[in-house]
């Protein structure tokens, strides 16, 4: 299968925990050592914890938690599950770590996660964000997680200004967060998610294209991709970003407003993420992206 999207074991060392649309990945590093990748949404705390406990008998053996970026749907579990993992170290970029020390940034993460709670749902006890056991990682740094797990940190800005990805050279596996955008499950292509800077977004995709041919590509939403979907992922995402730029500039040349195309993208793309991305927020994010592209895309003439 080109796409693995069911919770459970994905590879001999890899499991998907929780909801496939906002998953947490579990890496078996050795007989008594584990790592998590991606930080999910707060609503799924007990779901992810239950899945974790099916695979890990002793939570003190979870030693690392790798986070790609600061957005609410990639770190929402941290204050709820870190207190249950006494030996865990959270690894994220310096900018991500700083965001968790910002009262305003934390308020946004908590507010957006509260909007996703089920009826009558209450969140478990949490620690303070600034009490998380974090360590900042840098671009190019090698993370020696275990004897068979050596992952490289690669800066991948553009979607956000703090984004990093994690590359396992041994397995040619890339945990890419939202750096490539959102994988369109109906069409098999990438939908751009440029929420910070278009030039940085494209530069990141160019950099990822220079990696050895990937065997596994693991975005922050939707599961694991294999075959050509993995090998050509960064190239496809680059092409689709330029395609959207051309589409936007053409529509503007015809006198259409950003609002019209924002609404169109929201109607076409919003359904896939509706369970964790409220409609109003999705529409606003489409508008934000088009504003960025409008400012930075090369003109048609």
Swiss-Prot record:
GO term, biological process aspect, one: secondary metabolite biosynthetic process
Residues binding Fe cation 1: 69, 71, 159, 178
Reactions catalysed according to its record: (2-aminobenzoyl)acetyl-CoA + H2O = (2-aminobenzoyl)acetate + CoA + H(+)
Alphabetized InterPro entries for the sequence: Metallo-B-lactamas, NDM-1-like, RibonucZ/Hydroxyglut_hydro
Disruption phenotype: Mutant is defective in pyocyanine and rhamnolipid production and fails to kill worms efficiently, but can still produce PQS. Deletion mutant produces increased levels of DHQ, resulting from intramolecular cyclization of 2-ABA-CoA.
Residues that coordinate or bind Fe cation 2: 73-74, 178, 221
Other comment: As mutant can produce wild-type levels of PQS, it was originally thought that PqsE is not involved in HHQ/PQS biosynthesis. It was shown later that the role of PqsE can be taken over to some extent by the broad-specificity thioesterase TesB, explaining why the pqsE deletion mutant still synthesizes HHQ and PQS.
Role: Required for the biosynthesis of the quorum-sensing signaling molecules 2-heptyl-4(1H)-quinolone (HHQ) and 2-heptyl-3-hydroxy-4(1H)-quinolone (Pseudomonas quinolone signal or PQS), which are important for biofilm formation and virulence. Catalyzes the hydrolysis of the intermediate 2-aminobenzoylacetyl-CoA (2-ABA-CoA) to form 2-aminobenzoylacetate (2-ABA), the precursor of HHQ. In vitro, can also hydrolyze other substrates such as S-ethyl-acetothioacetate and acetoacetyl-CoA, but is inactive against anthraniloyl-CoA, malonyl-CoA and octanoyl-CoA.
Protein name as catalogued: 2-aminobenzoylacetyl-CoA thioesterase
Biological source species: Pseudomonas aeruginosa (strain ATCC 15692 / DSM 22644 / CIP 104116 / JCM 14847 / LMG 12228 / 1C / PRS 101 / PAO1)
Taxonomic lineage: Bacteria, Pseudomonadati, Pseudomonadota, Gammaproteobacteria, Pseudomonadales
């Amino acid at each position: 299968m080109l796409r693995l999207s069911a919770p459970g074991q994905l590879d001999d060392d890899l499991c998907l925990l929780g909801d496939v649309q906002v998953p947490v990945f579990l890496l078996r590093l050795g007989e008594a050592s584990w790592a998590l990748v991606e930080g999910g949404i707060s609503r799924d705390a007990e779901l992810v914890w239950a899945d974790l406990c099916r695979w890990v008998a002793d939570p003190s053996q979870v030693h690392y938690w790798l986070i790609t970026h600061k957005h609410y749907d990639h770190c929402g579990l941290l204050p709820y599950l870190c207190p249950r993992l006494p030996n865990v170290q959270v690894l994220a970029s310096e900018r991500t770590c700083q965001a968790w020390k910002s009262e305003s940034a934390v308020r946004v993460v908590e507010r957006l996660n509260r909007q996703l709670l089920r009826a009558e749902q209450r969140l478990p006890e949490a620690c303070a964000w600034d009490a998380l056991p974090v360590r900042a990682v840098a671009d190019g740094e090698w993370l020696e997680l275990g004897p068979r797990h050596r992952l490289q940190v690669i800066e991948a800005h553009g979607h956000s200004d703090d984004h990093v990805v994690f590359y396992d050279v041994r397995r040619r596996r890339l945990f890419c967060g939202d750096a490539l955008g959102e994988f369109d499950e109906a069409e098999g292509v990438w939908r751009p998610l440029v929420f910070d800077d278009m030039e940085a977004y494209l530069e990141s995709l160019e950099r990822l294209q220079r990696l050895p041919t990937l065997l596994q590509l693991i975005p922050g939403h939707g599961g694991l991709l294999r075959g050509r979907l993995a090998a050509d992922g960064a190239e496809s995402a680059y092409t689709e970003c330029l395609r959207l730029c051309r589409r936007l500039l053409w529509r503007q040349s015809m006198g259409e407003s950003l609002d019209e195309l924002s609404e169109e993208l929201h109607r076409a793309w919003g359904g896939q993420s509706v369970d964790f991305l409220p409609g109003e927020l999705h529409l606003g994010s489409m508008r934000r992206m088009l504003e960025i592209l409008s400012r930075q895309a090369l003109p048609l003439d």
